[in-house]
């Protein structure tokens, strides 16, 4: 089975652990963690990832700015990006999708939703 590299960008250690816990249940995924958008950009410049999961509300650089910058990088134009956030308003969702996010998941999250979304976006059979 191919190994997919997944970047999880989340400032809350508890939420980051929950997302990582869910992803570890999927075979063939290598996970890298970042604590904010700036840290995420550093990781993205050092390696290539097959999937990015990011929060919106983070210090230093928020997730929407991260998505916008990532989408302007030709090597990441088609890499799936999942927003995971407490922002549940439809205009927040529309804005995130408009700047390039592929999925928008609101907290509280179910680990099964993270797993199913990652598998689908990476093309891993259920």
Regions found by a protein language model. Name each.
Residues 13-32:
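Two-component/phosphorelay signaling modules centered on CheY-like receiver
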Residues 109-118:
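C-terminal output helix
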Residues 10:
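Conserved acidic carboxylate
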Residues 33-51:
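Acidic, metal-coordinating helix/loop segments flanking the phosphotransfer/catalytic sites
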Residues 58-61:
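Receiver (REC) domain active-site loop signature in two-component systems and cognate sites
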């Amino acid at each position: 089975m191919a190994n997919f590299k997944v970047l999880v960008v989340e400032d809350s250690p508890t939420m980051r652990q929950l997302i990582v816990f869910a992803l570890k249940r999927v075979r063939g995924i290598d996970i890298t963690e970042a604590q904010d958008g700036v840290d995420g950009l550093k990781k993205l410049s050092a390696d290539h990832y097959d999937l990015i999961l990011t929060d919106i509300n983070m210090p230093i650089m928020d997730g929407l700015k991260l998505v916008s910058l990532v989408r302007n990088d030709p090597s990441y134009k088609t890499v799936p990006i999942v927003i995971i956030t407490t922002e549940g308003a439809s205009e927040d969702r529309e804005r995130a999708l408009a700047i390039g996010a592929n999925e928008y998941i609101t907290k509280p999250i179910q680990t099964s939703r993270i797993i199913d979304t990652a598998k689908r976006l990476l093309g891993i059979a259920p």
